[in-house]
Amino acid sequence: MMRAKLAGYLERTQVVFNRYPASDNSLPALYARAIARNCSGKCADAMGDVDQLLREKPDNPYFWELKGNLLFWVGKHQEAIPALRKSLKLAGDESLIQAELAQALLATEDHAVLEEAIALLRRANALDDDNSMTHHQLAKAFYMKGQYPQADLEAAQAHFVEGNVKQAQIFAKRALVKLPRGSPEWIRAEDIVNYKEQT
């Protein structure tokens, strides 16, 4: 299955369809084709493959994750949430799925789900602090809450993880002005501001 997943994400669509033709109804073939279709913008076709995968293996968290991602990328954010919740329930503490669920929650722009999204993103960061997507999503959540210094700090952290130190330092300086001096957040911002790139 892992080989099919990697092929779906990394190979050109035609290569995937040659390796996993429509006549191949095995789970790896369905998985690879669904991912390839999703990545090439043919989400409606991919959804049929994903639904077939879920009929075969309803307890596979990664099939539910793919369904949630398909729904998210076609703009059906609200519909993506139950699939991603199911995926997370089945997968346990999977940082990427936590981040994807939080992203879907935030995309609804419903302020009632902000705390849940923030909690998911913080848990995801505790497991993998080097994922810039979680920091970008935390920045968005804090911005929606009106917590601008925290939003700036998370934006700084996202840019820092991506290797864009200058942009990270711009956001970190903005955060420093408003964060309580000496607080853990202030120290994080100061560390970014004082970082010197190796030459």
Protein language model features and the residues they cover:
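Structural motif corresponding to the intra-repeat A-B loop/turn of tetratricopeptide repeats
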Residues: 40, 74, 108-111, 145-146, ...
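Helix-start (N-cap) detector for alpha-helical repeat units in TPR-like alpha-solenoids
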Residues: 27, 61-62, 78, 95-96, ...
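Terminal, low-structured helical/coil segments at or just beyond the last alpha-helical repeat
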Residues: 144, 155, 161-199
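Extracytoplasmic and endomembrane cell-envelope/extracellular-matrix remodeling and assembly machinery
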Residues: 1-83, 181, 191-194, 198-199
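Canonical tetratricopeptide repeat
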Residues: 32, 66, 100, 137-138, ...
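Residue at a conserved register position within TPR or TPR-like alpha-solenoid repeats
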Residues: 37, 71, 105-108, 142, ...
